[in-house]
Amino acid sequence: MEDYRKKYPGLRPSFYGAQAYDAAQLINSAVVAVGGDTSKKDAMKAEMEKANFKSVRGSYKYGNNHIPIQNFYLQDVVKDADGQLSLKTVATIVKDDQDRFHDKCPMK
């Protein structure tokens, strides 16, 4: 977080920002894996399914229906060291959650 705050003064990191960053990293990992040849659509899809990148949110993988398996957190709104309101993660309330419809998906 320190690197982020130094690079973007006045902005606070967020889970939404982390998800957007992960999306860009996912696409980049696939483009790099196919040597920049984005016409290799099947190879890019296969690489994206591998999710071979380092997420800022920890391990990243997909369920059988291509929805991310992820943690959910309990957070409180608190004042940080600068007196600004921010989210503080209190606990992990669900670990490695897979959406409730994954078992109904034909993509096994």
Please provide the spans of the model-predicted regions.
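Extracytosolic ligand-binding ectodomains
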Residues: 1-108
